[in-house]
Design a protein with these regions (language model features):
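Charged, flexible cofactor/metal-binding loops and thiol motifs
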Residues: 105-121, 125, 132, 146-300, ...
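Intrinsically disordered, low-complexity, charge-rich segments with an acidic bias
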Residues: 462-479
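Helix N-cap/coil-helix junction residues
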Residues: 43-44, 206, 365
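A structural signal for small-residue-enriched, beta-sheet-centric alpha/beta enzyme cores
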Residues: 97, 210-214, 349, 357
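A general structural motif at alpha-helix termini
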Residues: 50-53, 204, 248, 257-259, ...
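A helix-coil-helix interface module used to build multimeric assemblies
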Residues: 1-180, 184-190, 195-197, 262-263, ...
């Protein structure tokens, strides 16, 4: 078939180049797993197709010429050319591009999300390391853009890390939907051959299949969930970066030499541009949600390009922006330094005025009256207008006293901060273990897939042996003693 030049340029060629660059390994994985399942069912030439696919994937895929419309038919035509039509046709029994494409898409996006979670963990680790290195360093925090109360740098950074941890959790939770395998759904009604869809999912390292076969090819919520999680991340990062830029503006945060740029005209300039670029990437994440929602909005619940091939390029761009935002923020933290003296630049008696109110209340003055008396003693919180000794007021309003009185859970007190740091480090360690287990599951599946049917059967046999040993061990433990 001769495709129109405009269609070739903007659709077929563009999609083929993207698939050739990003999706080919996932197509081969899905086709190999499917051929292995057909071979298990005893369908003719399926075992030969497994071998052919394993050999073919070592060769470069041809560039787009317009002779075939997509990567699947490029693989199919090569199979037919080198191994014959019967072998090529073997993998098409019951297989639709609907379930095949979405299996490859989900596997690709899953790998990208897993990699991004790793970047996320590195940033959280950097935040905690910088917080630990600046434990107890005081600074003045603001509310409504005005100086409010003292805190410490580690207390502030622990708050930022807590926000980022929730963003990490939301991104991690996208795998509950994304890490499910559509293969075996065929066009939409299910495969006409009795393939084991749970086995297919396991072969490809997925957590399990998308159960309903229409849902497997029709749903686009996996893309929406991912875009939503990335938008949340972009919002959180932009707030942190805005704070760092405000500190950099007054010299309290000095960006590392390799992350700042000068001016082509003003020789004195040393601009903290790494923070600006990180915030640009974070902003792109916020805008992505609208794009993905539009691609799903007002579309019928069935297989469509809108929420299959249509979401791949925008999601890929968003994942690239997320990686850039996380990594730029991380190196900005690791390669820059805070200036403690300038962090306290806004410290004044007024910043501790609430402590004077508390002191009067503790002496029996009604709160409303104490509040008015302190307001009347401003600026400077003059002790003679409060009816307290100067030395007592100075001691009460010291930073040390302020922090010591705030040993509540999550507070700025030294003990509370140390305990919060220990909890944050423990959560980070657990998240690293969880991510490592997920990576190991996918790596194992790919290793077994590369070995062919024998490798997967051997693994299943080992699992059965291990399970039997566990059962026997439990039975032995349950035997009555004596």
């Amino acid at each position: 078939m001769r495709w129109h030049a405009v269609y070739r340029r903007f659709v077929l060629g563009r999609h083929y180049r993207f698939a050739r660059e990003a999706l080919v390994p996932h197509f081969f994985d899905a086709l190999t797993a499917y051929a292995m399942e057909l071979a298990r069912l005893g369908l003719p030439r399926a075992d030969t197709a497994v071998t052919a696919l394993q050999e073919l994937r070592t060769l470069p895929l041809p560039s787009f010429t317009g002779e075939v419309e997509d990567v699947f038919f490029s693989i199919y035509s090569q199979l037919a050319e080198h191994w014959g039509e019967e072998v090529a046709g073997a993998i098409r029994r019951g297989l639709s591009r609907n379930d095949l494409d979405l299996t490859a898409f989900r596997a690709y996006l899953r790998d990208r999300v897993v990699a991004l979670l790793g970047d996320f963990l590195r940033l959280r680790g950097a935040v905690l390391r910088v917080a630990g290195a600046h434990a107890g360093v005081p600074l003045v925090l603001r509310t409504h853009h005005r100086p409010a109360q003292p805190s410490t740098l580690d207390h502030y950074l622990l708050g930022v890390e807590a926000l980022l941890e929730r963003d990490f959790r939301r991104l991690q939770q996208t795998l509950d939907t994304l890490d499910r395998c559509p293969l075996g759904a065929s066009a939409l009604a299910g495969n006409p051959y009795p393939v084991d869809r749970r086995r297919l999912a396991a072969l490809l390292g997925f957590a399990g299949p998308v159960e309903n076969t229409l849902d497997a090819v029709a749903s686009g919520d996996y893309a929406l969930e991912l875009a939503s999680a990335l938008a949340g991340l972009g919002t959180s990062l932009s707030r942190f970066l805005t704070d760092l830029l405000a500190l950099a503006e007054r010299g309290a945060f000095v960006v590392g030499e390799g992350l700042a740029q000068g001016s082509s005209f003003m020789p004195q300039k040393r601009n903290p541009v790494v923070l600006e670029h990180a915030r640009i990437y974070a902003g792109q994440l916020v805008g992505g949600m609208g794009t993905l929602a539009s691609l799903n909005h007002n579309t019928p619940f069935t297989d469509l390009n809108d929420h299959s091939t249509g979401v791949l390029e925008p999601l890929t761009a968003l994942l690239g922006s997320a990686e850039a935002a996380l990594e730029l923020t991380r190196v900005a933290l690791e390669e820059s330094q805070f200036e403690p003296a300038l962090l306290l630049e806004e410290l004044s008696p007024e910043v501790l005025a609430s402590e004077a109110v508390d002191l009067l209340v503790r002496k029996g003055v009604p709160l409303a009256e104490a509040y008015q008396r302190v307001q009347g003693a401003l600026p400077g919180v003059r002790p003679e207008l409060l009816g307290v000794e100067r030395e007592e007021l100075i001691a009460w309003m010291s930073l040390e006293g302020f922090f010591a009185r705030r040993e509540v859970l999550g507070g700025v007190g030294p003990k509370a901060r140390a305990e919060a740091m220990a909890r944050a480090r423990k959560r980070l360690k657990e998240d690293r273990k969880t991510l490592a287990a997920l990576r190991a599951r996918v790596r194992l599946a790919r290793r077994l897939l590369a070995k062919g049917p024998e490798g997967f059967q051997a693994e299943e046999g080992q699992k059965a042996t291990d399970h039997q040993g566990q059962v026997e061990g439990q039975e032995h433990q349950e035997e009555p003693l004596g």
